[in-house]
């Protein structure tokens, strides 16, 4: 990846990516694909199925969006980095006020052989150590919602993240799962939203202790 200024040294190489989306039942009503709820109330089932892939040639950021967060070396003591691959697939379904949105993401690393965490042959990278530098693993997110004709909206969501090496203490990606349940009311042509949202999250802390969090929030949102 490239530095942002002349003093910001480049680390690694280029990042490549692409995405494809198909609409087996035709397109959604105008603008309805870009909001969660089926405000336009599709008269027939509309589906978008998508897949994306990216390849970061020499990653030095946990998610491949920056550079220089860590340094690695080859056996000669020169800078060298692993490659980061990310694959995701998703599906969006809308019909008569109902919405289903689900996505899956998998991130892996390659070219890990003969990498070192310091410019010394005594510090060869161990398999689990890479998870302290790169966010590697799998994630699933599923959301469902329904909106009535008079603006009442209901939704639930579940997400799960599983690191490639779940028991590494300083893993860049931590095991967690969460549930959300919400109810909302839209006013003034859907420009004002009043929402009550409940959440339960279970995850592991830095010291690998399980932690549970519960919350209830009320939100007021004005859309322009």
Provide a role label for each language-model segment.
Residues 145-193:
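C-terminal hydrophobic structural anchor segments
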Residues 14, 96-105, 180-184, 188-193, ...:
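Gram-negative outer-membrane beta-barrel domains
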Residues 17-27, 185, 211-224:
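Outer-membrane beta-barrel "beta-signal"
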Residues 4-30:
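Internal alpha/beta core interface subdomains
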Residues 21-24, 28-165:
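Detector for outer-membrane/organellar transmembrane beta-barrel domains
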Residues 54-56, 195-218:
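Outer-membrane beta-barrel translocator/channel fold
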């Amino acid at each position: 990846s490239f530095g942002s200024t002349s003093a910001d040294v480049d680390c690694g190489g280029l990042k490549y990516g692409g995405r494809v989306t198909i609409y087996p039942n035709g397109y959604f009503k105008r603008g309805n694909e870009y909001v969660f709820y089926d405000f336009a109330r599709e008269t027939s089932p509309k589906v978008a199925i998508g897949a994306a892939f990216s390849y970061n040639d020499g990653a030095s950021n946990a998610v491949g969006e920056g550079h220089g967060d860590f340094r690695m070396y080859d056996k000669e003591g020169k800078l060298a980095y692993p490659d980061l691959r990310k694959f995701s697939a998703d599906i969006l379904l809308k019909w008569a006020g109902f919405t289903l949105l689900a996505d899956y993401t998998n991130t892996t690393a390659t070219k890990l052989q003969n990498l070192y965490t310091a410019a010394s042959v005594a510090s060869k990278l161990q398999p689990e150590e890479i998870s302290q530098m790169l966010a590697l693993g799998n994630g699933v997110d599923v959301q469902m919602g329904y909106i009535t004709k008079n603006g009442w909206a209901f939704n639930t969501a579940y997400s799960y993240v599983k690191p490639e090496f779940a028991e590494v203490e300083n893993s860049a990606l931590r095991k967690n799962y969460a549930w959300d349940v919400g109810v909302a009311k839209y006013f003034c042509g859907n420009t004002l939203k009043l929402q009550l949202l409940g959440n339960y999250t279970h995850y592991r802390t830095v010291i690998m202790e399980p932690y549970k969090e519960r919350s209830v929030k009320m939100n007021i949102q004005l859309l322009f």
